[in-house]
Swiss-Prot record:
Species assigned in the record: Streptococcus suis (strain 05ZYH33)
Binding-site residues for ATP, renumbered to this chain: G32, R35, R116, D159, R162, R165, R168
Residues binding CTP: G32, R35, R116, D159, R162, R165, R168
MF term (GO), any: ATP binding
A Pfam family: PolyA_pol
Keywords assigned by UniProt, alphabetized: ATP-binding, Magnesium, Metal-binding, Nucleotide-binding, Nucleotidyltransferase, RNA repair, RNA-binding, Transferase, tRNA processing
Reaction equation(s) it catalyzes: a tRNA precursor + 2 CTP + ATP = a tRNA with a 3' CCA end + 3 diphosphate; a tRNA with a 3' CCA end + 2 CTP + ATP = a tRNA with a 3' CCACCA end + 3 diphosphate
Domain of life: Bacteria
Name of protein: CCA-adding enzyme
Subunit description: Homodimer.
Coiled coil (UniProt feature): none
InterPro entries: Bact_CCA-adding_enz_type3_sf, CCA-adding_enz_C, CCA-adding_enz_firmicutes, NT_sf, PolA_pol_head_dom, PolyA_RNA-bd
Amino acid sequence: MKLNNLPSEFQEALPILEKIKAAGFEAYFVGGSVRDAILGRPIHDVDIATSSYPQETKQIFSRTIDVGIEHGTVLVLEGKKEYEITTFRTEEEYVDFRRPSQVSFVRSLEEDLKRRDFTVNAFALDEEAQIVDLFDGMTDLENRTLRAVGIPAERFNEDALRIMRGFRFAATLDFEIEPTTFEAMVQTAPLLEKISVERSFIEFDKLLMADFWRKGLRAMIDSKAYNFLPDLAGKSDELEAMLTSLTEEFRFSTSEQAWALLFVCLGIDNIKSFLKKWKTSNDFQRSVVKLVEIYQLRQAGPVTKQICFKYGKEFLYLVEELHQAQGFVTDFAAIDKIDQALTIHDKHEIVVNGGHLMKAFDLKPGPVLGELLKEVEFQIVEGQLENEEQAIMTFVKGILENE
């Protein structure tokens, strides 16, 4: 079969394939980019596989970088573009369910494609736009089916992260997982405990951000694979609640929004501790905590000036989107109105700081100074005090005189 419309990303990379072929070797576009081209989806990374060994690849191109040469990968710099070119390879036993004990370079495309995870990721595309499909992936694409290459249990034993990738592909492609493949996922799910948490987080996060995230999460719940992810063991009811609490068409705007809803459904108090186990960044943790706090505040009452000032309009909007999808009363207009009425949006905009107050009133650092600054901030946000030096000094003087 021939791909009728070769995407521009492939067209730009054709000279790479042609140079390798001119040197006497085979070269193909491979992997998910070929699948996406067939489906008419946007292409992200263009991966190239070749029969040339790494040292041979380096002789073909003048500008190369060894980015993973022990695994057969050479980065080729061509013009302003960079391309990862990987030698056809086979992989020996996976000793830790993540990495092969040994990689062997081969000249056979078929041997290379055999080690791929799913049939829809095992395509190759040559310079004439001919699709190489050795595992009937085209039929699976047409049937919107996710099927492991070869014996499913072997694929997941080789790299247990493929289980999470399977859920993610179901969510991004809107595919059904083929029954034998799904059963192998169920049986090998305990191996997820062997996978680095960071890698599992990336796949789970991509799942939640996908258009068909419900399908991926449904598969994860049905497989009980969540039992082998950090702090999710026994949480099937809570994960079900995440599925049922939102309108069918809802899509998450940000990762932080998705994880915030997860925590709302899980009912977890120590969110930072949970996210630390998932090895997330401090910024991510802080953002998710803020969203959960806002969610709880909105459950208790309307948005106030203090809430808007503390968290900012963008965060309030994200929570309001969740509320809207859950059928609660929302008021985006009120958030806009309050935000526009604020005379400051950050405490650093206040014209008087602690140093000014210490000098003017002979104060020392401590609780008294802290409370004064908080009260000044509160009154400015409420619109009861002008953000002007003389007005603030008079206000503080009045407080101190009345103590």
